[in-house]
Swiss-Prot record:
GO CC aspect terms: cytoskeleton; cytosol; endomembrane system; extrinsic component of cytoplasmic side of plasma membrane
Active site per the UniProt annotation: 945 (proton acceptor)
Protein topology in the membrane: Peripheral membrane protein
Organism: Rattus norvegicus (Rat)
Compartments reported by the entry: Endomembrane system; Cytoplasm
Protein's UniProt keywords contain Repeat: yes
One GO BP annotation of this record: negative regulation of thymocyte apoptotic process
Reactions mediated catalytically: L-tyrosyl-[protein] + ATP = O-phospho-L-tyrosyl-[protein] + ADP + H(+)
Keywords from the UniProt entry: Adaptive immunity, ATP-binding, Cytoplasm, Immunity, Innate immunity, Kinase, Membrane, Nucleotide-binding, Phosphoprotein, Repeat, SH2 domain, Transferase, Tyrosine-protein kinase
Molecular function via GO: ATP binding; growth hormone receptor binding; non-membrane spanning protein tyrosine kinase activity; protein phosphatase binding; protein tyrosine kinase activity
Lineage start: Eukaryota, Metazoa, Chordata, Craniata, Vertebrata
Record gene name: Jak3
Ranges for domain SH2: 372-472
Protein name: Tyrosine-protein kinase JAK3
């Protein structure tokens, strides 16, 4: 065969050529590893699962099981991808051609400082991909480029970039074939490594020009080959450079119909590092809807209209805060392609055990669920989990082999004279699907059948007897080597962390004065409280706000439960969710009084008793689903409720006139951890059995049990017989592992049984519960039905009529529907209030933070509008989220609506929780603030007011930059901004050039960041705040302006003193941030990896 000519591409234009004799076959194409047509796998008549075909292709390419989830099958033109559950049916006349490709991308994924797989410790992380995946990805990218699949530009800059890629391509060939550049170029042309359009352009040049270009390429090739980089480093460089030139190569876009866009199509874009974004047809700019961890559930329903390709499908994505995105796809294949993409990213980033829809569930994952088997986790994670479970002799883990698709591994704990040890057995699966232990010939139909046989017959491994006793089953959200940690994202805590029931609740709540409360009628009694109807009056700026409230008074006879009662109040004051009751605060005058919002229709157990059979199953299902949303929110926060029952579920809206019902979960009250056995027995069957067996403990799994019992309670329509039993019989019910009577809705039986499993480890996550509830009702038919419904079947929504679609832009909040709740903060220029946006007038709308100006002259209005435009354009995990705006009559006034973060500002948070915030958490906060500032700098935004008071706390592991009232956008072509009228300024946070010349830049923000580091490591202690320290340096007898004295101090080299507990490395970063010359200060993109490295190296 003659060597390729100058015009011969390494990849042929057609992927393959199929003759008529190949009819009735399925071909899976693999990316070519060199010149010639791609390798392909062919399959004859029959049915084939997409995931099974992927496994066959992975074996052919040397892709290990750990990396299997990065790949998928697509049509040859990449117009449609197939979910793992898709079945290909090959008949006599059919010929189908598919491509096996890497679908899930993480840009910048080389190097552990960018993206990596989760490790047990910060120094035990691993790369996302190995050399076989690297080779596959390189071949895939190179094939796309030289075949013309990627659109390319032909500017001089672009030509230089693609010639550089050709040099890298040729260099890796030289490494692979152990050839010198001259020898290689005798058989391969550099033009064969270029996109077709550039190849044609060069071919059309004069001989002299072609000769000059070739000489340049040869010289560059010799320099690259002479360096020490190996072939894999060259391939990695090629991939990163190509993804930099063509970011679209790592994204997928879908044309869809969006609500409010009429007939105009919109576009959804999915990327591994940013999640889901959307854009309408007339907008080029994409707006972020959510990142993958924010997704609660995804559903596919039949859309009302029919298109040319068949029935349209409506995909609904629900975000953690209750907002939804609805997109209409032209057909089921397109909808499944999109959902499978989101589903796959969620498993890679958040939870390797979860799937959103059964239509796209990987069959191997379903098999693992049925067999109580883990995925291909490494031995380190298996042993770690056994240790976390107590290293009990006989405990074991079943997992897929990380090396072989047809093998499973049994890792068990045994007791030896030297202590616990861990032994392993290899289990093989033959082509028929039967299982056998290596060394034993007996076959078994399932893994569980094999393990049962082992329990009866016993096992010997290395001369040690294995007596299997208890299985450590997979749990939702477990961290392992299957999880990818992305760059610039919140680092995840180590696996095995047991959430504390008081993770956020160190008695932090708003105190309400007794004289602001007005008492009305008594509404009854709780287990430990007396309950009253009342009003709260608050005067702000001369205006009186009157709010209807519920008053819960702690009974003086239960003083021993007072701390638990206040912990419940503290928990509710630090969470914000539509389906959780709002706590206004606590009044400590005499008795402890919890002041909550008043929910008019009361508890749903009472409501259901009143309405009886008139309440349809569809109504009950929506109420149950809303309760699951609330508990999922708490689960994601790591906060167990501990007292889930129908009497704790309050009905805010009945659900008539086409609006769905709306519920709110009330506070947990006194925790089961402090209750006596007699009181716990009285709570059967809502209290989880383990709460009785292990007094003083409360885990998230207990809420799953309570949810199951509450679901039974809502649907049964009859009293629970068990509640009338004697205490001894109640306990016997649990001892005998009794079950509640069967409901007439058999569809719910399986879900309730899973939630009320006596083994807490086998209860599903609330995301999985929501998925199963979604499966009970579709738009095609109703599975749950009542013969005599009394209430109209409303549309299935999370937050009802107050729901805001993500694609409304700008979001306009009607002023009349913003209900004042309390004052969050007040400054020289404006105030921020907590409001509920409640267009239906029934207290079911979301909580929001609303900023308004104190003085609204024309200049202040312009500055405020600028602040709004800046915040509106920002989409970052570490910057407070813009929600919308609200206009007064005639648009004479303007208010900014933002997300509400109940934990308040970082300054106050540090002061409150100093005792439990160690250096590792402070470094995490510092890194997050730095990443937020890096994001701002990349968008030419200078904050000008960076301080701990202007950073909000979302959770104990997440902070966000807020207050953009002084922010400025740098003019194009300039790196600084001169403020003409500085007004009142936070001078003790300002850089010298800002104080003397009103010059602000990214470098001046770096100076302020150094002060924030100081605030972090002094815990914002007032006695050593920046202002206190500088004023102390100035001395008591100072005269004149503090600004002049401060400038003199800084010019003399005086700086804030190093905090006593601050690591030396952080002190050095502070001093660099406070360099007098702005050019000597490190940039945020330099500080970020340094802080990340310090966080990873810190204990804890």
């Amino acid at each position: 065969m003659a060597p390729p000519s100058e015009e011969t591409p390494l990849i042929s234009q057609r992927s393959c050529s199929l003759s008529s004799s190949e009819a009735g076959a399925l071909h899976v194409l693999l990316p070519p590893r060199g010149p010639g047509p791609p390798q392909r796998l062919s399959f004859s008549f029959g049915d084939y699962l997409a995931e099974d075909l992927c496994v066959r292709a992975a074996k052919a390419c040397g892709i290990l099981p750990v990396y299997h989830s990065l790949f998928a099958l697509a049509t040859e033109d990449l117009s449609c991808w197939f979910p793992p559950s898709h079945i290909f049916s090959i008949e006599d006349v059919d010929t189908q051609v598919l491509v096996y490709r890497l679908r899930f991308y993480f840009p910048g994924w080389f190097g552990l400082e960018t993206c990596h797989r989760f490790g047990l410790h910060k120094d035990l992380t691993s790369a996302i991909l190995d050399v076989h995946v690297l080779e596959h990805l390189f071949a895939q990218h190179r094939s796309d480029l030289v075949s013309g699949r990627l659109p390319v530009g032909l500017s001089l800059k672009d030509q230089g970039e693609f010639l550089s890629l050709a040099v890298l391509d040729l260099a890796q060939m030289a490494r692979k074939q152990a050839q010198r550049p001259g020898e290689l170029l005798k058989s391969v042309s550099y033009k064969a490594c270029l996109p077709p359009s550039l190849r044609d352009l060069i071919q059309g040049q004069s001989f002299v020009t072609r000769r000059r270009i070739r000489r340049t390429v040869v010289q560059a090739l010799r320099r690259v080959v002479a360096c020490q980089a190996d072939r894999y480093a060259l391939m990695a460089k090629y991939i990163l450079d190509l993804e930099r030139l063509h970011p679209a190569a790592t994204t997928e876009s879908f044309l869809v119909g969006l609500p409010g866009a009429q007939e105009e199509p919109g576009c959804l874009r999915v990327t591994g590092d940013n999640g889901i974004a959307w854009s309408s047809k007339d907008q080029e700019l994409f707006q972020t809807f959510c990142d993958f961890p924010e997704i609660v559930d995804v559903s596919i329903k039949q859309a009302p209209r029919v298109g040319p390709a068949g029935e349209h499908r409506l995909v609904t994505i629900t975000r953690m805060d209750g907002h939804i995105l609805e997109a209409e796809f032209p057909g089921l294949p397109e909808a499944l392609s999109f959902v499978a993409l989101v589903d796959g990213y969620f498993r890679l980033i958040c939870d390797s055990r979860h799937f959103f829809c059964k239509e796209v569930a990987p069959p191997r994952l379903l098999e693992e669920e049925a067999e109580l088997c883990h995925g291909p986790i490494t031995l380190d994670f298996a042993i770690h989990k056994l240790k976390a479970a107590g290293s009990l002799p006989g405990s074991y883990i079943l997992r897929r082999s990380p090396q072989d698709y047809d093998s499973f591994l049994l890792t068990a704990c045994v007791q030896t004279p030297l202590g616990p040890d861990y032994k392993g057995c290899l289990i093989r699966q033959d082509p028929s699907g039967a299982f056998s232990l290596v060394g034993l010939s007996q076959l078994h139909r399932s893994l569980q059948e094999l393990l049962t046989a082992c329990w009866h017959s016993g096992l010997q491994v290395d001369g040690t007897a294995l007596n299997l006793t208890s299985c450590c089953v997979p749990r939702p959200k477990e961290k392992s080597n299957l999880i990818v940690v992305r760059r610039g994202r919140n680092p995840t805590p180590a696996p095995g962390h047991s959430p504390s029931c008081c993770a956020l609740t160190k008695l932090s709540f708003h105190t309400i004065p007794a004289d602001s409360l007005e008492w009305h009628e008594n509404l009854g009694h709780g287990s430990f409280t007396k309950i009253f109807h009342g009003h709260r009056r608050e005067v702000v700026d001369g205006e009186t706000h009157d709010t209807e409230v519920l008053l819960k008074v702690m009974d003086s006879r239960h003083q021993n439960c007072m701390e638990s009662f206040l912990e419940a109040a503290s928990l509710m004051s630090q969470v914000s969710y539509p389906h959780l009751v709002l706590l206004h605060g606590v009044c400590m005058a005499g008795d402890s009084i919890m002041v909550q919002e008043f929910v008019y229709l009361g508890a749903i157990d009472t409501y259901l008793r009143k309405r009886g059979h008139l309440v349809p199953a569809s109504w009950k299902l929506q109420v149950t689903k809303q309760l699951a949303y609330a508990l999922n929110y708490l689960e994601d926060k790591g906060l167990p409720h501990g007292n889930v029952s129908a009497r704790k579920v309050l009905l805010a809206r009945e659900g008539v006139d086409g609006n769905p019902p709306f519920i709110k979960l009330s506070d947990p009250g006194v925790s089961p951890t402090v209750l006596s056995l007699e009181m716990l027995t009285d709570r059967i069957p809502w209290v989880a059995p383990e709460c009785l067996q292990e007094a003083g403990t409360l885990n998230l799994e207990a809420d799953k049990w309570g949810f199951g019992a509450t679901t039974w309670e809502v649907f049964s329509g009859a009293p629970m017989h068990i509640t009338s039993l004697e205490p001894a019989k109640k306990l016997k019910f649990y001892e005998d592992r009794g079950q509640l009577p069967a409901l007439k809705w058999t569809e719910l039986e399986g879900l309730i049984a899973q939630c009320m499993a006596y083994d807490p480890g086998r209860r599903p996550s609330f995301r999985a519960i929501l998925r199963d509830l979604n499966g009970l009702i579709t738009s095609d038919y109703e599975l749950l039905s009542d013969p005599t419904p009394g209430i109209p079947n409303p549309r299935d929504e999370l937050c009802g009529g107050a729901q805001l679609y993500a694609c409304q832009d700008p979001a306009i909040f009607e002023e009349r529907h913003l209900k004042y709740i309390s004052l969050l903060g007040k400054g020289n220029f404006g105030s921020v209030e907590l409001c509920r946006y409640d267009p239906l007038g029934d207290n079911t709308g979301p909580l929001v933070a609303v900023k308004q100006l104190q003085h609204s002259g024309p200049e202040q209005q312009r500055d405020f509008q600028r602040e709004i435009q800046i915040l509106k354009a920002l989409h970052c995990d570490f910057i407070v989220k813009y929600r919308g705006v609200s206009y007064g009559p005639g648009r004479q006034s303007l208010r900014l609506v933002m997300e509400y973060l109940p934990s308040g500002c970082l300054r106050d948070f540090l002061q409150r929780h100093r005792a439990r915030l160690h250096n590792d958490r402070l470094l995490l906060f510092a890194w997050q603030i730095c990443k937020g500032m890096e994001y701002l700098g990349a968008r030419r935004c200078v904050h000008r007011d960076l301080a701990a008071r202007n950073i909000l706390v979302e959770s104990e592991a997440h902070v966000k930059i807020a207050d953009f009232g002084l922010a400025k956008l740098l003019p194009l072509g300039k790196d600084y901004y001169v403020v003409r009228e500085p007004g009142q300024s936070p001078i003790f946070w300002y850089a010298p050039e800002s104080l003397s010349d009103n010059i602000f830049s990214r470098q001046s923000d770096v100076w302020s960041f150094g002060v924030v580091l100081y605030e972090l490591f002094t815990y914002s202690d007032k006695s050593c705040s920046p202002s206190t320290e500088f004023l102390r340096m100035m001395g008591p007898e100072r005269e004149g302006s503090p600004l002049c004295h401060l400038l003199e101090l800084l010019a003399e080299g005086r700086r804030l003193p190093p905090p006593s507990t601050c690591p030396t490395e952080v002190q050095e970063l502070m001093q660099l941030c406070w360099s007098p010359n702005p050019q000597d200060r490190p940039a945020f993109d330099t500080l970020s990896p340094q802080l990340d490295a310090l966080w990873r190296g810190s204990p804890g």
